[in-house]
Amino acid sequence: MSRIHPTAIIEPGAQLHETVEVGPYAIVGSNVTIGARTTIGSHSVIEGHTTIGEDNRIGHYASVGGRPQDMKYKDEPTRLVIGDRNTIREFTTIHTGTVQDAGVTTLGDDNWIMAYVHIGHDCRVGSHVVLSSNAQMAGHVEIGDWAIVGGMSGVHQYVRIGAHSMLGGASALVQDIPPFVIAAGNKAEPHGINVEGLRRRGFSPDAISALRSAYRILYKNSLSLEEAKVQLSELAQAGGDGDAAVKALVDFVESSQRGIIR
């Protein structure tokens, strides 16, 4: 029995594993590759130079691999690469990259992308990320592993959201959120360490304590950013369980181009 509904359109050149399921009225473009056991919901459009891995579930009316919403785009063969075991719900839009960046939009593994999410051109989404309904990512946004973005939030282009961080719902984010930090508001401000999330992911009490100390240095001790960087670097060499996590935070702050929320 065919796994492709008779009303679906699979353009010549598309490469689908024999176990892929395609629902009614869906369209799969000629430059698309889809891995084993992935399902495509009814009326969805998968187009562009798009590669999708295994065991993904793409909901109804999703638009995956569409042209970048960038006026500089001139039909270059830019790409979208999606990993394995992602859930992409109804009416989500994910666009290919642009030549002004690396030319590729990427989505890792095991992500939970809820309805009406937008992932713009050149975004880099890690793994185990949750993007809640109506969260909107502008172009070039980077999201670290295990991050959560609340529903109806807007993220400015080129912003980075650190690993294990959390952005509350209906927030407007215009600068980077460091790893492990909770932020919320319009515009988004820091509100502590994501303690519950870190516990669920197996961070030790000592590591969480070290990150709390790092947060106080960065946000509570009335230090300039340069002064805070010095103290954070010292904390990252304390010889405890939290050294690696604090170092990841320090490296993120040091590499920020738009500046961090403060």
Curated annotation (Swiss-Prot):
Name the principal localization, coarsely classed.
cytoplasm
Q: In which pathway does it act?
A: Glycolipid biosynthesis; lipid IV(A) biosynthesis; lipid IV(A) from (3R)-3-hydroxytetradecanoyl-[acyl-carrier-protein] and UDP-N-acetyl-alpha-D-glucosamine: step 1/6
Lipid biosynthesis as UniProt keyword: yes
One Pfam family, short name please? Acetyltransf_11
Q: Could you mention a single GO BP entry for this protein?
A: lipid A biosynthetic process
| Enzyme type, top EC level | transferase
InterPro entries to which the protein is assigned, alphabetical:
Acetyltransf_C, Acetyltransf_C_sf, Hexapep, Lipid_A_LpxA, Trimer_LpxA-like_sf
Membership in a protein family: Belongs to the transferase hexapeptide repeat family. LpxA subfamily.
Q: Known NCBIfam families for this protein?
A: lipid_A_lpxA (TIGR01852), PRK05289.1 (NF003657)
Q: What is this protein called?
A: Acyl-[acyl-carrier-protein]--UDP-N-acetylglucosamine O-acyltransferase
Q: Kindly list the organism's lineage.
A: Bacteria, Pseudomonadati, Pseudomonadota, Betaproteobacteria, Burkholderiales
